[in-house]
């Protein structure tokens, strides 16, 4: 079957992004067995990032948001993150080495992954779900030290998407949305490009 049963208790407009951003962030959190006791970092606090924070918190993890925009801190905490690290600061990663079990990178801009990898605990994984236009490079030593892994994830299948929708219904999780009229679409696009959403 290709139809989903939508939770009756959730707003329809706020559920729409769950079928993209929702499952894209839920799937790797489940695959890497995030739950109580997990120490998770979410890089980026946009459309994907805010969903990753909500899901990881609901799964029982301690969540830290990594963002170059300190204006995102209040939203990160409102969604349940316990910590916020401003990655716009030089040497931001110092003092956070070997802290996280999992980093979910939701950023679509090019990032130097080396500082992020240094914050992974032994056997930690950095999962890429943002799609930058430039390739990144990683030194072998950054992976060998601590047996770290670098992986990627893209969306999820139909059964997992239904599981995610059910989880959202049970935990009252929806995307943050702004509903607009059709005549505002060009302005909305411009705002999205300018990161004004």
Q: What feature does the model see in each segment?
A:
Residues 130-147, 158-167:
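Rossmann-fold NAD(P)-binding glycine/threonine-rich loop
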Residues 114, 158-197:
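C-terminal hydrophobic helical "lid"/dimerization subdomain
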Residues 29, 53, 73, 113-116, ...:
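Generic hydrophobic/aromatic pocket-lining and core-packing "Φ" positions
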Residues 39, 124-126, 149:
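Short glycine-centered segments of the SAM/dcSAM-binding site in methyltransferase folds
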Residues 1-43:
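NAD(P)H dinucleotide-binding glycine-rich loop of Rossmann-like/cofactor-binding domains
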Residues 49-50:
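N-terminal Rossmann-fold NAD(P) dinucleotide-binding loop
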Residues 120-122:
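Helix-to-beta-strand junctions that scaffold the AdoMet/dcAdoMet cofactor pocket
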Residues 36-45, 57-115:
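Adenosine-nucleotide cofactor-binding segment
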């Amino acid at each position: 079957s290709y139809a989903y049963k939508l939770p009756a208790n959730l707003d329809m407009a706020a559920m729409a992004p769950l079928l993209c951003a929702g499952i894209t962030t839920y799937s790797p959190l489940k695959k890497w067995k995030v739950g109580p006791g997990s120490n998770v970092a979410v890089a980026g606090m946009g459309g994907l990032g805010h969903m990753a924070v909500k899901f990881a918190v609901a799964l029982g993890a301690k969540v830290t948001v990594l963002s170059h925009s300190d204006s995102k801190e209040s939203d990160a905490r409102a969604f349940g993150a316990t910590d916020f690290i401003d990655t716009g600061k030089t040497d931001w990663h110092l003092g956070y080495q070997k802290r996280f079990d999992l980093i979910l990178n939701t950023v679509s801009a090019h990032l130097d992954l080396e500082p992020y990898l240094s914050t992974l605990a032994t056997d930690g994984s950095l999962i890429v779900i943002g799609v930058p236009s430039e390739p990144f490079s990683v030194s072998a030593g950054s992976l060998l030290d601590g047996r770290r892994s670098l992986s990627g994830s893209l969306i999820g299948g139909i059964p997992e998407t239904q599981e995610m929708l059910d989880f959202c219904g049970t935990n009252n999780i929806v995307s943050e949305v702004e509903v607009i009229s059709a005549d505002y679409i060009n302005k909305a696009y411009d705002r999205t490009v300018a990161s004004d959403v």
